[in-house]
Structures are given as structure tokens and as C-alpha cells.
């Protein structure tokens, strides 16, 4: 079983879907604290109740978080360090999708500027802001409390499939994967690992928009493994879940 016992984790997009599944599994496996950041507060109370039922010893700290704001992300991570004193791992799962098969060809003509920017602000800028703040906190904490630390960024199998559609989504997720691999080489000397998970699409919303789907728990197991000590030799990987790489 992947070891995450007694550790502190930050999860963006953690109140629903893959993020909530990751939180539940981390609690089941003994995580000390889960710091959840999500733009939508609707599911936070339910998540807190779920975690309490799974493991009453796991603390849950929920924050309304806009990952497209670097200052918002920086304050969130600073608050985690101030409140809990450390950060052992992070999963950056917050993201937004585009509907596939909804536009007439050539679909590039309907890829408008506003939609492009919105998708990139969350799916790529948000990953940059979150990863940067987490690395800063982990580097500072590891100087006084050394140990293996891990960051997992969630991209998508769509980043590899070269679909003639959803250009902003696929391109932003490809950027996420490339960025994470580069960061992994940068931070490994400081005892920080960075990896990517690229799942097939998850949940009914995406199914209605033309994607095949897998369960959130399937993706969560891979994320938690990468956050755990069991994956210590692994860094710079991009692991596909639920579908073969094209």
C-alpha cells in the first residue's frame, strides 16, 4: 500500500471529481492533513464529512481558490505552511474542459480568443502558479525538515491524441505535461519529484460531450501512488490512465 501516512498535502480542484477521489484515498491511507483548494465551495462540506467518516484523524482545510490568480495561490500555500508547518505533497487537478463534437469543421474557426484564454488561465497558468508556490514552500521546508516531496500535475490523454477539435484544452494539457517534465529536472536535486498523470476523461459531464470515461477513483490511485514513498525513484514521468497513448 502506498505510504502517505502522517503527511500534509495540497490539492487543487479537490472538492469534486478526481480531486475529491484523491482526497478520500489519501485519508484512507493515513494522510495527516488535506488542504483543499477549489473555486466552487458547493461540495466542500460533503467532502469534509466524507473524510471524517473515512479517517477521523485526517484534518481537512478547505479554501475557495482561483488557480488563475497567482496571488491567490501564493496566499493559499503560505497559509498552509503557517497553519500546518510543512507541505509534503501536492496534486494540481483543477482544470476546465471544452466540449468535443459541438462545432462545425473547420472547428478552428470557432476557437474564439476569450475561450482560449480562459482555458489556458486555468489549465496551464494555474499549474504554473500552483507548482511554483509549492516548490518554494517545499524547498524552504526541506531545509529544516528534509525528506522526499512530490508534486503531481494532471494533464489529459487529449494532449496526445491530436484531435481536430478542443484546441485550447488539448494544447493547454500538452503544455502542462511538458512543463512538468522540465520542472522535474529542475527540482529533483532539492528532493522534490514532479510527475504528470494523463487520464482519459472522467465523469458524466464529459461523457455527454463525446468523450469515453473512466472512474475518478482509477485516476486517484495513480496520483496517490506518485505522491507516496512507493514511487520515490519516479520523476519526470507522464503516466496515462484509462487509455493507451496514441
Curated annotation (Swiss-Prot):
Reactions performed catalytically: chanoclavine-I + NAD(+) = chanoclavine-I aldehyde + NADH + H(+)
InterPro entries noted in UniProt: NAD(P)-bd_dom_sf, SDR_fam
Signal peptide: 1-20
Molecular function (Gene Ontology), one example: oxidoreductase activity, acting on the CH-OH group of donors, NAD or NADP as acceptor
Enzyme Commission (EC) number: 1.1.1.332
Keywords for this protein: Alkaloid metabolism, NADP, Oxidoreductase, Signal
SUPFAM superfamilies per record: NAD(P)-binding Rossmann-fold domains
CDD domains membership: SDR_c (cd05233)
UniProt binding sites for NADP(+): 18, 66, 132, 169, 173
Pfam families named in the record: adh_short
Active site residues per record: 169 (proton donor), 173 (lowers pka of active site tyr)
EC class (word): oxidoreductase
Pathway info: Alkaloid biosynthesis; ergot alkaloid biosynthesis
Domain of life according to the entry: Eukaryota
GO biological process: ergot alkaloid biosynthetic process; protein homotetramerization
Keyword Oxidoreductase annotated: yes
Primary role: Chanoclavine-I dehydrogenase; part of the gene cluster that mediates the biosynthesis of fungal ergot alkaloid. DmaW catalyzes the first step of ergot alkaloid biosynthesis by condensing dimethylallyl diphosphate (DMAP) and tryptophan to form 4-dimethylallyl-L-tryptophan. The second step is catalyzed by the methyltransferase easF that methylates 4-dimethylallyl-L-tryptophan in the presence of S-adenosyl-L-methionine, resulting in the formation of 4-dimethylallyl-L-abrine.
Family affiliation: Belongs to the short-chain dehydrogenases/reductases (SDR) family.
Subunit structure: Homotetramer.
Protein name: Chanoclavine-I dehydrogenase easD
Organism per entry: Arthroderma benhamiae (strain ATCC MYA-4681 / CBS 112371) (Trichophyton mentagrophytes)
UniProt lineage: Eukaryota, Fungi, Dikarya, Ascomycota, Pezizomycotina
Gene name, Swiss-Prot/TrEMBL: easD
Amino acid at each position: 500500500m502506498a505510504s502517505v501516512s502522517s503527511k500534509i498535502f495540497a490539492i487543487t480542484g479537490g472538492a469534486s471529481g478526481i480531486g475529491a477521489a484523491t482526497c478520500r484515498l489519501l485519508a484512507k491511507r493515513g494522510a495527516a492533513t488535506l488542504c483543499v483548494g477549489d473555486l466552487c465551495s458547493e461540495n466542500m462540506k460533503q467532502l469534509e464529512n466524507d473524510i471524517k467518516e473515512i479517517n477521523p484523524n485526517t484534518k481537512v482545510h478547505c479554501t475557495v481558490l482561483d488557480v488563475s490568480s497567482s496571488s491567490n495561490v501564493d496566499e493559499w500555500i503560505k497559509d498552509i505552511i503557517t497553519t500546518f508547518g510543512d507541505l509534503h505533497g501536492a496534486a494540481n487537478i483543477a482544470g476546465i474542459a471544452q466540449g468535443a463534437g459541438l462545432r462545425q469543421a473547420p472547428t478552428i474557426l470557432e476557437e474564439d480568443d476569450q475561450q482560449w484564454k480562459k482555458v489556458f488561465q486555468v489549465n496551464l497558468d494555474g499549474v504554473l502558479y500552483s507548482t511554483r508556490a509549492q516548490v518554494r514552500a517545499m524547498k524552504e521546508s526541506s531545509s529544516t525538515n528534509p525528506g522526499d516531496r512530490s508534486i503531481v500535475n494532471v494533464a489529459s490523454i487529449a494532449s496526445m491524441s491530436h484531435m481536430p477539435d478542443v484546441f485550447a484544452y488539448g494544447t493547454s494539457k500538452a503544455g502542462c505535461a511538458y512543463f512538468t517534465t522540465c520542472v522535474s529536472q529542475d527540482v529533483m536535486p532539492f528532493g522534490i519529484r514532479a510527475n504528470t498523470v494523463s487520464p482519459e476523461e472522467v465523469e458524466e459531464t464529459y461523457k455527454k460531450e463525446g468523450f469515453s470515461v473512466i472512474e475518478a477513483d482509477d485516476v486517484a490511485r495513480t496520483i496517490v501512488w506518485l505522491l507516496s514513498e512507493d514511487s520515490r525513484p519516479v520523476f519526470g514521468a507522464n503516466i496515462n490512465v484509462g487509455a493507451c497513448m496514441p
